[in-house]
């Protein structure tokens, strides 16, 4: 299956789960970039729910290839700040950073941004990690039984990110 076929397979699965978006989806052009934006949009609006293993395998293959195309930045190779051993400052796409953990500026529900293709860091992280991140966050919040207080954090898997944890 080539890239456009992977994207279209994932779109079809998501549209079966969320048929309310079928008419809007038909308006998207068939080129790869437009179909990628449609896929990301559907992933952004998908509420947490069980994930089909065949969908996850296809999603993970696509997101892994995307990660490799963007390139990975090794956190342990970044230059340290003069006079501050062990501290490095890096500015760039956080979804490329291979580190033990990255920090997401999420909301108190920890479910990620639901605005399709929004430019916020929360959307970028959830989009690059895959739907497993929203699913894990949903389970954590359900167990907690209340919104996450400001300044607090939860640790989740990084899934398709180069970082091990978010």
What role is predicted for each listed range?
Residues 1-166:
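Macrodomain-like recognition of ADP-ribose-binding/processing modules
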């Amino acid at each position: 299956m080539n890239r456009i076929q992977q994207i279209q397979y994932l779109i079809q699965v998501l549209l079966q789960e969320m048929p309310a978006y079928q008419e809007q989806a038909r308006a998207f052009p068939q080129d790869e970039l437009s179909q990628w934006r449609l896929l990301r949009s559907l992933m952004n609006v998908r509420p947490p729910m069980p994930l089909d293993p065949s969908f996850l395998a296809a999603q993970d293959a696509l997101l892994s290839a995307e990660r490799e195309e963007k390139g990975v930045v090794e956190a342990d190779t970044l230059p340290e700040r003069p006079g501050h051993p062990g501290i490095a400052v890096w500015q760039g796409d956080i979804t490329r950073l291979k580190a033990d953990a990255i920090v997401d500026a999420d909301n108190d529900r920890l479910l990620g941004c639901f605005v399709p293709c929004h430019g916020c860091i929360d959307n970028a992280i959830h989009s690059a990690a895959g739907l497993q991140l929203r699913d894990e966050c949903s389970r954590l919040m359900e167990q907690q039984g209340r919104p996450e207080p400001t300044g607090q954090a939860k640790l989740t898997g990084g899934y398709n990110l180069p970082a091990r944890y978010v």
